[in-house]
Amino acid sequence: MTDHELSESEKAIERYKVKKLIQMLESARGMGTSVISIYMTPKEQISGMVTKLNNEYGTASNIKSHTNKLSVQSAITASLGRLKQYNRLPPNGLLLYCGTVLTAENKEKKLTLDIEPFKPVSRSLYLCDNKFHTEELHRMLESDEKFGFIVVDGSGTTYATLCGSVKEKLSSFTVELPKKHGRGGQSKNRFARIRMERRHNYLRKVAEGATQLFITNDRPNIVGLVLAGSAEFKEVLYQSDLFDPRLKAIVVKVVDVAHPGDVGLNQAIDLAADALSGVKLVQEKKLLQGFFDQIACDTQLYCFGVQDTLKCLEAGAVETLIVYEDLNIYRYTVVKNRGADDEETFVHVMSEEEAKRSNIHMQESGKTRNEIEQEDFVDWLATNYRKFGCALELITNRSQEGTQFVRGFGGIGGVLRYKLDIIALRDVEKKEDDEERIAANNEEFDFDDDFM
């Protein structure tokens, strides 16, 4: 799936996955300089990288340390093996990480990871080092929301956009406006009239240029607009009827800068940084306020808390699933009596503290350990949410609404597509649990053995 096909919420999910991936890769350390990082751009040929790796394999034979030589050659072999699984590169290129790393328990572990990124890979790289290089993954985290800038003063105007860390100057022009006429006499009013007319025409040109550059198909092609300048022109433009109302509606900040042109543009970008980062928070606040409104109006079209939200998900009732991205909850798959006739599998979703208190690692007898698979619950949701027919919105706690959602509602909730009696679902689950408990007790209780 390419970046252009992703919705904003899907991009947020992909960024979340990349952040988790970066954490994992940056915590790994190689055995010597024996871990490999490979970046392949969309235009590259797999055959070219295969040739390079084969050459590097031969070069590695000159490494003096026998252990390091074997580790490097093993990583190269693993990289070649993974590349052979591709007939052609994915549309956005490929990232490949291979090598033997030390785990947190100081144990060796072989790692081979191929990543099809959701944004195009920007550069080619082959590097053998003692750590994985994640610069390209960090670039994937940059916002792809595009903001417009207009730097306007009495000497001219500059138009530009900013997308992530990429600045693009779209257009600029200079102007010579008449100064205030200091002399009196009959010509004073005439010069003032000419001056005002020239200023008006200048602002008209600025406004028309903004519409041409920042409006496409009758709608803004940017998510926000910053007006900057050293004089009053920016405020006059903002308040003018000449300024397109569609652009006026998305002005996120008006800032004073000391210089025109490129220098003023750089100043404007620095001064507007807080407003640009706040656009995502505004969207987040709007989403959560809608959720809170459902609760305040008691529409019964909402759920919150881990267990109730899971019940609604399994019932297919959730339209929009809202989850705090740093939710400290795990999904435990518990297997009892693996391989036996009475093998059973259970799934628990809880915190690590709850798992310890519930003692899910031990069977009821307390003598046999269960087989446990532990997975971050948000990771699991990010992978599986589509199976439940819902959209997934990942939120932070950087806004007041986000903090309230985490503290007051457990950091997870949903907007439902139809009303659901959650209390009735709880009662059904409780009844099923009671029946299972009674059945288990009946199996343990043998009348003939105990009373005959």
Curated annotation (Swiss-Prot):
InterPro entries: eFR1_2_sf, eRF1_1_Pelota, eRF1_1_sf, eRF1_2, eRF1_3, Peptide_chain-rel_eRF1/aRF1, Ribosomal_eL30-like_sf
GO BP, one annotated term: post-transcriptional regulation of gene expression
GO CC annotations on file: cytoplasm
Record's keyword terms, sorted: Cytoplasm, Protein biosynthesis
One matching Pfam family: eRF1_3
Subcellular localization: Cytoplasm
GO molecular function: mRNA binding; translation release factor activity
Highest taxon, organism lineage: Eukaryota
Main subcellular location of this protein, as a coarse class: cytoplasm
Its biological purpose: Directs the termination of nascent peptide synthesis (translation) in response to the termination codons UAA, UAG and UGA.
Summary of subunit composition and partner proteins: Heterodimer of two subunits, one of which binds GTP.
Family, similarity comment: Belongs to the eukaryotic release factor 1 family.
PANTHER family named among the record's database cross-references: PEPTIDE CHAIN RELEASE FACTOR SUBUNIT 1
Protein name: Eukaryotic peptide chain release factor subunit 1
Species this protein is from: Trypanosoma brucei brucei
